[in-house]
Amino acid sequence: MKRLAFLVFFLVASLVLGAQGLELPKVGRGEIIVVHTGHTLSYNPKCLIPDWVAYELKASKLDGDAQRRKSFSPDPSPVLKGYAQAEHYDYTHSGWSRGHMLPAGDSKYSQTVMDESFYMTNVCPMEPSFNNGPWRRLEEKIRKWAVEYGTVYVIAGAIVGNNRHGKVGDSDVVIPDLYYKAVLVPYKGSYLTVAFVMPNEATDKRKLKEYAFPVDKLEKAIGKTLFYGLPKSAARRIKPYIPLKELGLY
């Protein structure tokens, strides 16, 4: 069974890395990788949330008439067979919202992609005013970058930290302390990168630039190489830098 599980992981990871999507991080041994039409994720069966969700966002795909689903459902991917998942009702009346990692607002171009964004593997417990405040403002800013630059590459992730918020629901879904998004933007023949690290707590009035973080420091904090498809020379040059002016983060 372990050999079969490793073979499945190897084949899926090879598929993911072979695609060379710039949004993808370096996949570690043992990660449970799920590839959907609109996003790729790494599932954490102990916490019942995704460790990260990566996706490409194109300006040409920001519009569409795909309909939001009325509820969330378990992810039917065969890769997840045998693993526990959270349920929609785990969040009901809990005081925590179902926070999208791949936003539904970025999924309107395809009903399939929209439906996938409502899998439980694409959501994490978020404090409601955070989900509807800084997290939403960041989603909107990233859409503006997609319009301006044509395509952006995004990875969203959860940082459990000290798990000071505990768990939610009968399934014991772990509530992360922090969330992050890292963004790769094509810029004048090269790229820019920026990360945002946000506490999972009641909203405050900080501007987005106050959450900005160099991607290389985020990588050290989470122990993962982001945007693994970038040439190393470009990564060394741009990851330590926060391009506040270039990206309009005033």
PLM region spans:
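Domain-level detector for secreted/extracellular nuclease and nuclease-toxin modules, and
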Residues: 15-250
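Positively charged n-region of N-terminal signal peptides that target proteins for export
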Residues: 1-4
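Hydrophobic h-region of N-terminal signal peptides that target proteins for export
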Residues: 6-18
